[in-house]
Amino acid sequence: MKILTFGEIMLRLKAPGHERFFQSPMLEATFGGGEANVAVSLANYGMDAEFLTVLPKNDIAECCIRELRYFGVDTKKIVRGEGRMGIYYLEGGANQLPSKVVYDRAYSSIALAKPGDIDWDKAFEGVAWFHITGITPAISESAMELSLESVQEAKKRNITVSCDLNYRKNLWKYGKKASEVMRELAKYVDVAIANEEDVQKSLEITVDVNVESGELDREKYRVLGNKVLESYPNMKCIAITLRESHSADWNGWAACLNDGKDFYVSKKYEIRDIIDRVGGGDSFAGGLIYGLNNYEDKQSALEFAVAASCLKHSVIGDFNRVSVSDVAKLMGGDGTGRVQR
């Protein structure tokens, strides 16, 4: 089955270790972006994964494409356009000092892209599953219009659409609230992925959940999922990640899935000494897409997604460099971290 993900991939510039920005005169350069991260996860699991974006014609973009190809992601559908490559700067947190992200995405190639710039007949050729996030619609008004066009074109072709709502308050700067856009985009989504804040800010659907407290009441998430599915009858299910933030490097991690009939809750992992949590949600999304297409029951699909994401917290960089067997071992209870010989 061919899976296409669509969004922006950026140059990631990170302060070394747990240093503050420019504490030393260097930044570690890699690449990353929500939808690209999902494509890499799926390729690592042996799925036929393609990534679609708009990139400039320069050497940095070429290096980015080569990096994706290294992981087995098909990049043939990437469109070249005007503009620049987006950048994000990352400062890794520790203990009570949170991680910090600074975006530099204005006038990037995908921010300048508009409806009509992508040949959707070509893009969706052979595709059975399409994945997008709420990040691309936040970048610019034209990128928002292109995102809406993408899901509309996908549904015309009866392609399954998954969307990670991914609310990013610092990106919505062109005059529209996230909910104005995402409530429309959600009408074309089959599988929704979110955390509690995403649902509240992107869909304006709430229950009495304190998103800042770090404490979880799972019954309220059942109600929250029900409200989303009642509001969007097109959705087949919604998965909600459950993160308890004790500190920047100690999180509790679990998820639930609601398909309107049954409510599934995963095992909870206590993740201590987090190495890099950026991309953790994307690794969950990639794991869920894999799980829903490779397991007969939704509980196993959910457990795979949560275990995959748990492992990502110990992997440096945006991409989740783990295999199906790595995830399966953790699902099976092998989480000791002992040397495997």
Describe each region flagged by the PLM:
Residues 48-135, 327-341:
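Conserved N-terminal subdomain of the carbohydrate kinase-like
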Residues 158-165, 171:
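Short beta-strand/loop segments at the ligand-binding rim of alpha/beta enzyme cores
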Residues 264-334:
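Conserved post-catalytic alpha-helical subdomain immediately downstream of the catalytic base
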